[in-house]
Amino acid sequence: MSKYRIELRPAAVKALRRIDPQDRSRVQGAIALLGEDPRPPGARALQGRDGYRVRVGNYRIIYTIRNDILVVVVVTVGHRRDVYG
């Protein structure tokens, strides 16, 4: 059972649909693991805004953590060249 609940923002859901199926599966697996450990090895705090990022190949998962209510909010997902803009 997950320690943290996962919430996907509409932008993240839309972005996931645009990723090819093989990469999407890997990204979805990484998102699911955030429920167990919201700060896994390799996660980095974002500079200039709240939140964290996790690398999954060439893709990045941008998310925030609500420790008060044990929720990980996935803000967006995208290719590394596009996701930070």
Where are these regions (language model features)?
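Enriched for short, Lys/Arg-rich terminal
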Residues: 1-6, 10-25, 55-56, 64-85
